[in-house]
């Protein structure tokens, strides 16, 4: 595929999604598909929850525009459409967690039975021996679908973060697939980014605060499901493009945040789904950073971790078990910092004060 053709298609997806999201936000306000401020949500006014619907519309436009061969594309669109619909209903009417979990489980089973997408192997994470899962792989796949959806849902706490982290994951997968010759799957990843960008622009208020939109559960569910579908498509089979352990690096920050916060909640005797303000973005902001700075820092950290995974995938000289050990070390470092968040926050504030004093005491140079 020519690069110019690919760029023109991505620009078309971006423009279509931009127009769609402006139209969708007007409809959302009329039908009450909006987010209202409460004790946990500090935004002002009602915000349309149309980010996810717009991303899905952009992806449908992409597949209608092109003739890429994507295995089981129709099944993906049906499954994703159901999840987006249920997510939108939850955004509007607040559906119970149990109903959403059942729907996600049914979709996962359909994906495994019809598309034959499931975890059959975790690769060579124990040295020269491949870890083949057998029938247990189906149960692990069910958990992986649920985990991916909830991991991306949990990071949707400050402006731009869900869009930034998901774009990092899709960019990492897209680069690996593009240079591996899997151009159709790569374009799917890049199209997701093109469809997410208009949401990021409006969510951050780049085009004006009055046009602000949120992703909503429909969007976080769509993104998590698409990520796990692509990872199952590309990490399994004899000729897989991505090693299973690399998938951990590609979704590192959402995965680490979900595991860490659920562990803390369970230790306190709380439900793992109970809301709190202990996510990574809350802790970074508690250290003295603004919402925008936290978005940039966390997205940059995700890009660095994903970059490590992509580099290792291409180098071929780093064994998979070494990459797993390095990931676990990164996870334990993350857990250590989160557990001692107040110390980390105090250290960062001290450094920031010292830098401010140095700038203030620096003599002005005149010609």
UniProtKB/Swiss-Prot annotation:
Pathway entry: Bacterial outer membrane biogenesis; LPS O-antigen biosynthesis; Bacterial outer membrane biogenesis; enterobacterial common antigen biosynthesis
The EC number(s) this enzyme carries: 2.7.8.33
**EC category:** transferase
**Pfam families, per the entry:** Glycos_transf_4
**Which family does the entry's similarity section mention?**
Belongs to the glycosyltransferase 4 family. WecA subfamily.
State which residue ranges cross the membrane: 3-23, 45-65, 69-89, 129-149, 158-178, 187-207, 213-233, 242-262, 318-338
Q: Which cofactor does it need?
A: Mg(2+); Mn(2+)
- Could you tell me which InterPro entries the record lists for this protein? ECA_WecA-rel (IPR012750), Glycosyl_transferase_4 (IPR000715)
Record's protein name: Undecaprenyl-phosphate alpha-N-acetylglucosaminyl 1-phosphate transferase
- What are the record's GO terms for cellular component? Gram-negative-bacterium-type cell wall; plasma membrane
Q: Where in the cell is it found?
A: Cell inner membrane
Q: Which UniProt keywords apply?
A: Cell inner membrane, Cell membrane, Glycosyltransferase, Lipopolysaccharide biosynthesis, Magnesium, Manganese, Membrane, Transferase, Transmembrane, Transmembrane helix
Is Manganese included in the keywords of this UniProt record? yes
Biological process annotations from GO: cell wall macromolecule biosynthetic process; cell wall organization; enterobacterial common antigen biosynthetic process; lipopolysaccharide biosynthetic process; O antigen biosynthetic process
Provide the species name.
Salmonella typhi
Which PANTHER family is this protein grouped with?
Answer: PHOSPHO-N-ACETYLMURAMOYL-PENTAPEPTIDE-TRANSFERASE (PTHR22926), UNDECAPRENYL-PHOSPHATE ALPHA-N-ACETYLGLUCOSAMINYL 1-PHOSPHATE TRANSFERASE (PTHR22926:SF3)
State the annotated membrane topology for this chain: Multi-pass membrane protein
Q: Which domain of life is it from?
A: Bacteria
